[in-house]
Amino acid sequence: MVSLHDDERLDYLLAEDMKIIQSPTVFAFSLDAVLLSKFAYVPIQKGKIVDLCTGNGIVPLLLSTRSKADILGVEIQERLHDMAVRSVEYNKLDDQIQIIHDDLKNMPEKLGHNRYDVVTCNPPYFKTPKQTEQNMNEHLRIARHEIHCTLEDVISVSSKLLKQGGKAALVHRPGRLLEIFELMKAYQIEPKRVQFVYPKQGKEANTILVEGIKGGRPDLKILPPLFVYDEQNEYTKEIRTILYGDK
């Protein structure tokens, strides 16, 4: 039986018929991670996937419903790592998903170069120029701000881990899209697919999904936009399907 700590809860992933351990004081996944797990290419039958900055394991759990590939999640925060491990155990996915507690910058040396088919990441979004701009909760501060890893770290490590032709998928903020493109190209990952996510019609995009191929040829595709809320401030049909399935 998987135990919960005092500040933890067990949330349903309705579309996937799974449960995940969350904590309002430590970490709770956002819609961004769910969108990344639906956006990323994954091999259906076999292969090797790495999810960097895995948090409580939300992306590996969701990817396991789309792929039979071996999935590895990497998380630097010990408490989040523990939550992810217990969530994997609760869903009886130990044979497919492994969660390791380590710094993602160590992964090329530990896991080997050119060995993975897919790398996914929902990285910290914000640079950390001033202490006053950082969230005061340590767990959230590390998850949201580039304290232990930068965007360049994520992309350079992804490139080292990927096979030629392997795919890297990120979710991030639109303001850093050009930086993502520049870094991908610098590390031999060619941007291939981009999708802009909007809070609702008439608003600016607040999230981007980007996928690149290691050693790929230039041919960028802009996918149709994704709107989260309709005019009644309810989830759009597409988002409802992603979150709740076709029920």
Swiss-Prot record:
Gene3D superfamilies: Vaccinia Virus protein VP39. Coiled coil: none annotated. GO terms for molecular function: methyltransferase activity. InterPro entries: SAM-dependent_MTases_sf, Small_mtfrase_dom, tRNA_Adenine-N(6)_MTase. Belongs to the methyltransferase superfamily. Methylates cellular RNA. This is Probable RNA methyltransferase YabB. It comes from Bacillus subtilis (strain 168). The lineage of its organism: Bacteria, Bacillati, Bacillota, Bacilli, Bacillales. The gene is yabB.
